[in-house]
Amino acid sequence: ETTTALLANKVRTGLTVLGIVIGIGSVIAMVAIGTGAQQSVQESIQSIGSNLLMVRPGSQRGPGQPVSQGQGSAVTLTLEDSNAIKDTVSSIEAIAPVVSSNSQVIANGQNTRTSISGTTPDYVSVRNLGIDAGQFFTAEQDARLAKVAVLGPDVVDTLFGDGSSSGTSSVDPADVVGRKIRIGGIDFTVIGTTASKGGSGFGSEDDVIYVPLSTAMQYLSGSDALSLINITIANESE
């Protein structure tokens, strides 16, 4: 549906691309303000990937409303849309659809509420995500709806450390691998933890729990609607 809409509304698609180009120009102008601001912006962009494109579902905007982050007029995005984009855009290097939600998480006698991201193994490369201990889940685990989870460092500290959520865990991440947690009343096994990336204008990935996309759709979100599609574009020089 999304791909069809883009092809059927070439003018609107062109304006959307223009909006993204203008947005990039604004970032470039902002970077030029000063050395300090430049370094901060560059570090934020590099932490998530300098060739990253984020596609979000949205609603129809009126005249004068800006276009941002590839947000379009489709009310929902689905896995079929993600696959269609991957199959039709030749410059795509990797793609990682995401289903996001907030859920109650219980472990080790601790009870908290945090962000849950259901995604695919390519998320690691698409978002420059480092693995601190254990491993990220595999395509095979995603396909069989495995109840496995990868924890950000803030989550590790909240559930298994001193609860400070400081970005520097007070517990050895390796000791968390193999532990059980409950997400929305469902048992998951921790198979890995991510390296700290810190917070930025793009948000923090330290206070997130990652689970396989199919698992999230089946057990947590109850829907096949995607929250976001992360795409990395191949560099022209490659």
PLM features: what roles do these ranges have?
Residues 22-25, 29, 33:
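Hydrophobic alpha-helical membrane-associated segments
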Residues 1-22:
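N-terminal Sec/SRP start-transfer signal
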Residues 17-19, 32, 185:
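Residue-level recognition of transmembrane alpha-helices
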Residues 35-115, 119-125, 139-140, 217-218:
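Hydrophobic, regular-secondary-structure patches
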Residues 122-141, 146-238:
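Mid-to-C-terminal secondary-structure elements
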Residues 8, 42, 50, 153, ...:
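ATP/adenylate-binding site constellation spanning eukaryotic-like Ser/Thr protein kinases
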